[in-house]
Structures are given as structure tokens and as C-alpha cells.
């Protein structure tokens, strides 16, 4: 009985912890660099805007961020035209290689992995395809407007590529579909949020496009790429204080995090048959703990009586 109770208690404790962990992040996890302020990588709960400082990137400026299907974070340093890979544990970034063929003067940049698995960069009104292993760059063509952010989700009727972009500066607030063969941007409409610069990325699990504005303070928001409706507008906060200066965004698929990020333990997925919805894990835990304690305290007494018989 004692062993059974201990096993049950252990499983319920794990279930309760998973339930609380799932509640802690109601939306997808985003990553962004506060490049206009401290050059640190931050983890952001996109449902609430609550940010956590991960660490210094080690680069003067990171304009675009993207996350691969394997959870690796990539970024672009415009001043040196480098593709970098960033750690979700320390925030430190390391150069992958030089992006060839880019103009000397780089401005706002958008970076994302599309649903076809390719990595795309928008910079200086040109769209590029990038090899994430070598940083080899191929220009697809002019986008027309200068894009500040790119997001890759599933294709839609109005955007067969599933690659979306958002304008900045003179094209602020405008939402586009990007042709992955020519780089051309087709205007889909205008959004309510219209920052001069924006970080953008998509959640492949839900099809939603997420953004973060380079305002003071910054705001996170979600875009339905079909209806163009905007929701979940929240101010970015750090320890309860509103902050800004973000110019990039990488969104991890809902329920996951970047490689090495301790907020979601990979081992948790290996624990079988433990429901995590609702409040029952905590209630069951409250019931089983007293029973386990009773079994533990009574066991020595029972053994002692047996020895004296």
C-alpha cells in the first residue's frame, strides 16, 4: 500500500507541476532582442507580454530573428551582414557566416522560416533565401515596399506561399503576402498597429501571426492572416515595468520552446497518461498526501508489532 501511494503521489505531483507550467504560458513563447537598449535576448509570453531577460547577445544589433523546426534561434546582424545563431540558455549569439550580396547600407530586416522549411530574409526592399547552415544568400527579387518583419505560417487562399510581411517606415501598418519565387509583396490590407519597426513571426501550430512593436513601451499582438483582425494586444513588461526597444521576433510552436530553454523540459513529454487540464491534479494531490503520510507513519509500527509477536 505504501509503495502504491508513493507512486501515485509522485505521478500526481508531476501532473500538478505540468498543469501549473502549462498555465504559466497561456500563449506561444516568443524570443526578441532589445537591440535599441541593452542588446539582450528576452523570452516573452506572447499571451501576456511578460518578458524574461535571458542574456547579452554579444552583437551590436540583431534586427531579425527566426526559429527552426528543431528549435534553433537564428538572427541577422545588419551592420556586419552576418547570420547568427543564438542560445536560449545564455542569450549569446555566434556567427554562422556572412550574408553575401547584401547592400552596404542595411536597414530594417525581417527573418523567418516558411512552411516549406526555407529561411527567408527581407532587407532593403529585397527578399532573399538563406541557407541556415552556411549563410549562403540568394536574392529572389524586389519586394516593392520595405519590410520590417516576416512571418511563415500555413498557406491561405489569399497567400498561397504562407509567407507574410509587415511594412515599416513609410509603409507602416501594411500587411503583405510574399511571393517566394519572385520576392514580390502583394498588399493584403492595413492593420491597427502601425509601428515604424516591428518584429514578426508565425506560430505553425495555430496559423496565427504574432508581432512586437518597436515602440516605447513595446506591444505584442496577434494577427489573423485571413481576416487581418488584430487581437491580444498587450504591453511588454519586465518585472512589472513596461519596456520597449524590440526589433525582432521568433515564435516557438505552441507548447514548445527553443533548444535548451528550461521553461519547458523535454523530459516532461515522455511521462505517459498524465492529464494536465483543469484543477483535479492539485485536488487529488491534496487528498493523497495525507494518505501517504499515514501509510509511512503506520508502517514501522506494524513491523514492530510483528517482531514482538
What spans do the regions from the language model cover?
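Cytoplasmic C-terminal tails of single-pass
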Residues: 301-309
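A short beta-strand motif characteristic of beta-propeller blades
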Residues: 50-57, 92-102, 136-142, 184-191, ...
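A cross-kingdom C-terminal cell-surface attachment/processing module
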Residues: 279-301
Amino acid at each position: 500500500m505504501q509503495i502504491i501511494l508513493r507512486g501515485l503521489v509522485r505521478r500526481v505531483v508531476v501532473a500538478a507541476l505540468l498543469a501549473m507550467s502549462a498555465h504559466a504560458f497561456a500563449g506561444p513563447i516568443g524570443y526578441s532582442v532589445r537591440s535599441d537598449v541593452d542588446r539582450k535576448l528576452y523570452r516573452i509570453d506572447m499571451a501576456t507580454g511578460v518578458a524574461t531577460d535571458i542574456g547579452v547577445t554579444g552583437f551590436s544589433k540583431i534586427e531579425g530573428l527566426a526559429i527552426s523546426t528543431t528549435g534553433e534561434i537564428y538572427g541577422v546582424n545588419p551592420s556586419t551582414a552576418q547570420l547568427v545563431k543564438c542560445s536560449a540558455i545564455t542569450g549569446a549569439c555566434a556567427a554562422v557566416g556572412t550574408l553575401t550580396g547584401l547592400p552596404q547600407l542595411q536597414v530594417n530586416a525581417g527573418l523567418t522560416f516558411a512552411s516549406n522549411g526555407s529561411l527567408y530574409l527581407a532587407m532593403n526592399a529585397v527578399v532573399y533565401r538563406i541557407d541556415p547552415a552556411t549563410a549562403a544568400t540568394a536574392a529572389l527579387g524586389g519586394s516593392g515596399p520595405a519590410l520590417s518583419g516576416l512571418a511563415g505560417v500555413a498557406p491561405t487562399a489569399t497567400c498561397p506561399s504562407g509567407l507574410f510581411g509587415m511594412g515599416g517606415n513609410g509603409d507602416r501598418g501594411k500587411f503583405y503576402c510574399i511571393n517566394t519565387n519572385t520576392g514580390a509583396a502583394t498588399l493584403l490590407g492595413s492593420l491597427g498597429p502601425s509601428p515604424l519597426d516591428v518584429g514578426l513571426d508565425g506560430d505553425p501550430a495555430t496559423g496565427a501571426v504574432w508581432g512586437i512593436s518597436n515602440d516605447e513601451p513595446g506591444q505584442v499582438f496577434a494577427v489573423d492572416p485571413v481576416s487581418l483582425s488584430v487581437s491580444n494586444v498587450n504591453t511588454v513588461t519586465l518585472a512589472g515595468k513596461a519596456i520597449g526597444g524590440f526589433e525582432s521576433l521568433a515564435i516557438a510552436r505552441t507548447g514548445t520552446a527553443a533548444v535548451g530553454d528550461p521553461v519547458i523540459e523535454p523530459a516532461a513529454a515522455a511521462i505517459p497518461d498524465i492529464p494536465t487540464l483543469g484543477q483535479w491534479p492539485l485536488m487529488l494531490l491534496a487528498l493523497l498526501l495525507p494518505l501517504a503520510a499515514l501509510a509511512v507513519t503506520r508502517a514501522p509500527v506494524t513491523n514492530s508489532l510483528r517482531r514482538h509477536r
